[in-house]
Amino acid sequence: MDSSNCKVIAPLLSQRYRRMVTKDGHSTLQMDGAQRGLAYLRDAWGILMDMRWRWMMLVFSASFVVHWLVFAVLWYVLAEMNGDLELDHDAPPENHTICVKYITSFTAAFSFSLETQLTIGYGTMFPSGDCPSAIALLAIQMLLGLMLEAFITGAFVAKIARPKNRAFSIRFTDTAVVAHMDGKPNLIFQVANTRPSPLTSVRVSAVLYQERENGKLYQTSVDFHLDGISSDECPFFIFPLTYYHSITPSSPLATLLQHENPSHFELVVFLSAMQEGTGEICQRRTSYLPSEIMLHHCFASLLTRGSKGEYQIKMENFDKTVPEFPTPLVSKSPNRTDLDIHINGQSIDNFQISETGLTE
């Protein structure tokens, strides 16, 4: 086979993995050959925040166990150096000062290390005030233990309070549609805030990713607007919002959506919003493939009125689409419209709809 006739296929969007960003916003890209040295380990806080909860719990549990074991070894070494392991602690020699009472084995040393870190008082095992080495080691263990507990507590609070958790309540429609608005085609998707607390300063941006034959990804910005709002952001997000992209000849999607089976691309949508209570920015992402963009469809209605006149949101219709009925763009008269009748793909005749009925 002539290698010059072979196409170079980029591994980023191969036949097996056709999506860069999942529907819930996670990236599927994998870094092969990336070296994780000291520069990576310096960001220990970021590594912890990115960990899954099960790994985070494992790391924290291991940190406590290692801390207890290290100081258990130190307490055992102190008892060995002071000659306390072989003594009768109930009747010690008069000229001998026991540093820690009843540490006669490594098990006892580990128990004392655990007791020092987790309790506010001692039982039968306790350090002697006449042994400076024991007092110094006790102070070091307490200081490092408090630092470890503060770090772990802060990491738990930071992970729970991340704005990322608020973003999970933002929901995009599973599909986007291409429908006509004011006679012009528009790419449309909807987004909903599933929590009663509002979001403010909502911004939406989108990037179109296309794979070229040279193995590179080409990125194009796609602009979306919200109804008739002229500003770049929506000031209040409590009910579902509908975003539109006008498919004009200059639109990057114009040539891609002309056919029923367009070439592969991925449209990644980013929504950023501010939490009203905390002022923190959260971001939600999703992506749409060509198979997830429905031509000549529109979304079902979401807003209804209740018995008392209040607005109600029918979330069961959030992902529901209905076929778009074609509307004539040109009419011969205000009361007369041409209508072509097709049976099995064959044009039969031309009729006109008037106020009095169907005429030939």
From Swiss-Prot:
Tissue: Predominantly expressed in small intestine. Expression is also detected in stomach, kidney, and all central nervous system regions tested with the exception of spinal cord.
Catalytic activity: K(+)(in) = K(+)(out)
Intramembrane segments: 106-122
Domain of life: Eukaryota
Membrane topology reported for the UniProt record: Multi-pass membrane protein
Disulfide bonds: none
Transmembrane segments: 51-77, 132-157
Keywords: Cataract, Cell membrane, Disease variant, Ion channel, Ion transport, Leber congenital amaurosis, Membrane, Phosphoprotein, Potassium, Potassium transport, Transmembrane, Transmembrane helix, Transport, Voltage-gated channel
Cytoplasmic side: 1-50, 158-360
GO cellular component, one term: plasma membrane
Keyword Secreted recorded: no
Positions of modified residues (Phosphoserine): 201, 287
Stretches of the chain found on the membrane's Extracellular side: 78-105, 123-131
Regulation: Inhibited by Ba(2+) and Cs(+), although sensitivity to those inhibitors is much lower than in other Kir channels.
Gene3D superfamilies in the record: 1.10.287.70, G protein-activated inward rectifier potassium channel 1
GO biological process terms held by the UniProt record: potassium ion import across plasma membrane; potassium ion transport; regulation of monoatomic ion transmembrane transport
Sites annotated Role in the control of polyamine-mediated channel gating and in the blocking by intracellular magnesium: 149
Molecular functions (GO terms): inward rectifier potassium channel activity
One of the Pfam families matching this protein, by short name: IRK_C
Intracellular or extracellular location(s): Membrane; Cell membrane
Keyword flag Manganese: no
Post-translational modification: Phosphorylation at Ser-201 by PKC strongly inhibits ionic currents, while phosphorylation at Ser-287 by PKA increases them.
Family in the record: Belongs to the inward rectifier-type potassium channel (TC 1.A.2.1) family. KCNJ13 subfamily.
Oligomeric form and interacting partners: Homotetramer. Interacts with RAB28; the interaction may facilitate cone outer segments phagocytosis.
PANTHER family: INWARD RECTIFIER POTASSIUM CHANNEL, INWARD RECTIFIER POTASSIUM CHANNEL 13
Protein name as it appears in the record: Inward rectifier potassium channel 13
Originating species: Homo sapiens
Gene: KCNJ13
